[in-house]
Amino acid sequence: EGEVMTYLRPDSKSQVTIEYDERTNKPLRVHTIVVSTQHDEFILPGNGLTEKEAEERMQERIREDVRTILIPRVKARLERAGDKLAGLIGDDYILHVNPTGKFVIGGPHGDTGLTGRKIIVDTYGGRGAHGGGAFSGKDSSKVDRSAAYASRHIAKNLVAAGVADEVLVELSYAIGIAQPLSIYVDTYRSPRPAALEGMTDGEIARRIGRLFDLRPAAIVKRFGLKNPIF
């Protein structure tokens, strides 16, 4: 609008993680909000201010503006539209803004080449769900590749262990944050072995989080993904 947050530039993305009731599958609340936005370098080092201090002040200003200007406006717009989603935005959400720090260079200059192709052919055809991330053009430092391998590894082991006949494992990440923001499991109502009778998909997901180190660097190390053999 040219009145507030005038330092913003065109390249940006957001990610919202919603917590659901695992029994009714109804949304409970907004759990995490991630906003990555390009911006001017509107605070510069100098006059006793170091480069690191200047960057920290910029990011703190952007975080505060997202929290006090952007999110309240989004909520107000949803309320005016009578959208029930407005009720999911409380005060207890986790907020990450520009988790990797300064984001001045954006658009094609910043991301050219990080694309992909044939994402469905490379994975499960039309049989399984896909989050949209491609393997092509990306090394294993990108969760599009490494976390896809990790989720497949977990799913294969759940089936091999008899936990489910069929299972979907979904991992959600945000740039600059090592741990997944959410772990979702769907066993498609597969029968459980006697020892696991009554265990919900949500409990399986929580156990996955405790048993597996799902940080990208840990996945790379576990599977030896720095070796160019895939």
Model-found features: residue ranges?
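Glycine-rich, mobile lid/loop segments that gate access to catalytic sites or pores
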Residues: E1-I105
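Short beta-strand elements
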Residues: S14-D40, H109-G128, L171, I183-S190
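Short acidic, glycine/serine/threonine-rich loops at helix termini
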Residues: L28-V30, G46-G48, G107-G110, G132-F135, ...
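Conserved active-site and cofactor/substrate-binding residues in soluble primary-metabolism enzymes
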Residues: R57, R61-D65, I69, G116, ...
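Flexible helix-coil linker/hinge segments at domain or subdomain boundaries
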Residues: L70-A81, K138-D144, S151, N157-V167, ...
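Conserved ATP-utilizing enzyme core subdomain
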Residues: I94-I120, I229
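C-terminal catalytic subdomain
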Residues: R117-I119, Y124-E170, A178-D186
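Internal helix-turn-beta structural module
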Residues: E166, Y173-F230
